[in-house]
């Protein structure tokens, strides 16, 4: 998603909204959370939710603008966002793309296709393989 943001941030506004914790330590802890050291209890206050979001942004150097759902979970309820989901809202405020629920139906490549159709594809220069001369000069 960060690469998608970097590619299209000059054409579209991006926002990540932190909703309730997907795998909190006091509910359904995952081994991957322990491995990646992202272990949090389910926040009980907005201040706790803000602290977790700020920790995420800082630890992962996350560049996408961040919003935080309130404790009534209004954004989560309106967009069925938990545990993760992608949306494109068009310039008229209408939902132009509604992705499936993550993690299995979380498909940033579908958002990329929508953005490419709307704004044009972003080309990335491919890394060149080492030349044969460079490999033979080491022998």
Predicted segment positions?
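Structural microenvironment flanking redox-active thiols in thiol-disulfide oxidoreductases
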Residues: 1-60
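Sequence-level detector for tyrosine residue identity
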Residues: 5-8, 18, 40, 62, ...
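Loop/turn elements at helix/coil->beta-strand transitions in domains of secreted/extracellular proteins
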Residues: 9-13, 61-65, 83-84, 91-92
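Conserved beta-strand termini and adjacent loop/short-helix elements that scaffold enzyme active sites
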Residues: 17, 67-69
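General secondary-structure edge motif
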Residues: 33-37, 66, 73, 95
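Gly/Pro-rich cap/lid or specificity-loop segments adjacent to the active site
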Residues: 43, 64, 71-74
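Thiol-/selenol-based redox modules, centered on thioredoxin-like
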Residues: 70-139
